């Protein structure tokens, strides 16, 4: 093969890889409650959303990565319930106890169905922090414990986002929004 042909193939492969990296499907991975895990049962059946068929996403379940059907939720995050509520916030919560729900679709407008002291009720969502979580690579080492230090962005200090890692969800410095756009542009320029 000529060097020009080899270079062209390499650039095409890199372009396809970069495009695959940025593919994220709509919807969310279903909630998962961690139980004791036998690490011998760990499986990596997908690497990212692009490796899953149709609308399925690559979701972490314990130490395994599986293609799963997503849950459809409204934008934003449920607010974190605090024990130090002001009287006006407490009054608002009591009013909301009359508006129970099962899913986001049961709430009017932009409100989300969130856990509260009176069950599932409708709340106005908290916005996710800007930026993009880094891609998850590898699997959690056998000797390292697997756990979440956060569930949502609003539980992370400063600009950090709550992102998946090989060993659970952690507060992480995100890539800026422009990072994804500049990667797409460089891929197009390379082709």
From Swiss-Prot:
Glycans are attached at residue 69. The keyword Transcription does not apply. Disulfide bonds join 29-59, 42-63, 46-58, 52-67, 78-114, 97-118, 101-113, 107-122, 133-163, 140-167, 150-162, 156-171. Milk-specific; major protein component of milk whey. GO terms for molecular function: serine-type endopeptidase inhibitor activity. It is found in: Secreted. It comes from the Eukaryota. Residues 22-71, 72-125, 126-175 form the WAP domain. InterPro entries: Elafin-like_sf, WAP_dom, WAP_four-disulfide_core. Keywords: Disulfide bond, Glycoprotein, Milk protein, Protease inhibitor, Repeat, Secreted, Signal. Residues 1-18 form the signal peptide. Pfam families: WAP. One of its GO terms (cellular component) is extracellular space. The keyword Transmembrane helix does not apply. Could be a protease inhibitor. This is Whey acidic protein. The gene is WAP.
């Amino acid at each position: 093969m000529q060097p020009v042909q080899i270079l062209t193939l390499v650039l095409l492969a890199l372009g396809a890889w970069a495009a695959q990296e940025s593919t994220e499907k709509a919807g969310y991975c279903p909630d998962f409650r961690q139980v004791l895990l036998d690490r011998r049962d760990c499986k990596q059946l997908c690497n990212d959303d692009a490796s899953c068929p149709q609308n399925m996403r690559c979701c972490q379940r314990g130490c395994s990565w599986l293609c799963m059907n997503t849950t459809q939720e409204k934008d934003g995050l449920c607010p974190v319930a605090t024990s130090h509520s002001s009287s006006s916030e407490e009054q608002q919560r009591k009013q909301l106890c009359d508006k129970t729900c099962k899913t986001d679709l049961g709430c009017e407008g932009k409100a989300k169905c969130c856990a509260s002291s009176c069950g599932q009720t409708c709340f106005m969502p908290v916005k996710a922090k800007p930026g993009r979580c880094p891609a998850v690579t590898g699997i959690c080492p056998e000797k390292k414990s697997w756990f979440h230090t956060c569930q949502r962005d609003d539980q992370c200090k400063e600009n950090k986002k709550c992102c998946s890692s090989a060993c659970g969800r952690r507060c992480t410095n995100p890539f800026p929004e422009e990072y994804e756009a500049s990667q797409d542009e460089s891929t197009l320029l390379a082709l």
